[in-house]
């Protein structure tokens, strides 16, 4: 049975990244570089994926989990040596293997699929993914024979003047016949100035054996961009962001200013939703239809239903149901569940709380560790005092309750259904249903106090 595999090389140190982390776990739009490569491989229909790890191997394994097979390169002795560490998975197999790098996040599943199909159709022993660059300086050139097959790969420093004029370059990504590759790896040596085993030498070995080596040009040369430093990381991020935004726009989402909008790969957005400038949508956020998001909002792993507005606000790991309005300048913290037709207004903070349908929390309010019922009104300046210095306590506010301005609810406490709390109160005990709670001192008037105390304020001439 024909086998289809991929080997992703991800063992390098990545010194130019100047980072404490492994290069391939640096993220673009919420996904590690190596995960981008893995997803493209899987979407191309390849089920068996081997990841060659080395530098900070445990960190890479933690990110990738058990969805890949692992090979370990103890010493970084070149790309060919890295591939040699995966030989146990190639042994005695017939079929094809795609070899690519964990720091090439822009490679697409279409390019991988096209390469495999071309490799089969041409009956190649190896197929190289190539690109045409206006400025190919520093890259290995593809020298073709008259029939279009690859005659050799010549490195820039070794190329003649005529060869340096060739603009087709080697991407370093290949499709091999597995049996031909395993035989070529047996002949690979490190007889060079660096003392390393080069993957490109396998191509020379196959050509010298009379095997057919072909090349397929990638349509977009940015796909082969390798990430070696933070500048290239930012450039790849710009390209991936553009792809993501275009996909959403083609699927019926309006994005007012793509240049200032950041949306992670796993975000889902329904049709006719409008995303305003300076908005960041991260993680596995899911947004329904006909929503207004932004300007200046940040959503992380949020679940947003239909016709919701989130303006100039932050929503973290929480859900918001249909027809609710949030903001401006609201903060919905993790673990919150906001119902339908709710208003969360300016400078309101909700933390790990449930807010019932049709409830209004319009401004300057903190609600933490609380259950707030349906059709409740919390006035300006209400504070749920949930922390006693040792632990967080729960507050329950029943349906149709009314809590006036500048009220402190000292948790644990309960305001029953249909109860009222007068403005300025500090509530420490249960407020029964249909009752009014007043917890403030009576107002005292001292007549002529200002004159008697000499406190009269007069404008200076």
Curated annotation (Swiss-Prot):
It catalyses: alpha-D-glucosamine 1-phosphate + acetyl-CoA = N-acetyl-alpha-D-glucosamine 1-phosphate + CoA + H(+); N-acetyl-alpha-D-glucosamine 1-phosphate + UTP + H(+) = UDP-N-acetyl-alpha-D-glucosamine + diphosphate. GO terms for biological process: cell morphogenesis; cell wall organization; lipid A biosynthetic process; peptidoglycan biosynthetic process; regulation of cell shape; UDP-N-acetylglucosamine biosynthetic process. The keyword Cytoplasm applies. Binds 1 Mg(2+) ion per subunit. Residues 1-230 are annotated as: Pyrophosphorylase. Residues 252-461 are annotated as: N-acetyltransferase. Its EC number is 2.7.7.23, 2.3.1.157. Keywords: Acyltransferase, Cell shape, Cell wall biogenesis/degradation, Cytoplasm, Magnesium, Metal-binding, Multifunctional enzyme, Nucleotidyltransferase, Peptidoglycan synthesis, Repeat, Transferase. GO terms for molecular function: glucosamine-1-phosphate N-acetyltransferase activity; magnesium ion binding; UDP-N-acetylglucosamine diphosphorylase activity. Coiled coil: none annotated. Acetyl-CoA binds at residues 386-387, 423, 440. HAMAP family: GlmU. Catalyzes the last two sequential reactions in the de novo biosynthetic pathway for UDP-N-acetylglucosamine (UDP-GlcNAc). The C-terminal domain catalyzes the transfer of acetyl group from acetyl coenzyme A to glucosamine-1-phosphate (GlcN-1-P) to produce N-acetylglucosamine-1-phosphate (GlcNAc-1-P), which is converted into UDP-GlcNAc by the transfer of uridine 5-monophosphate (from uridine 5-triphosphate), a reaction catalyzed by the N-terminal domain. This is Bifunctional protein GlmU.
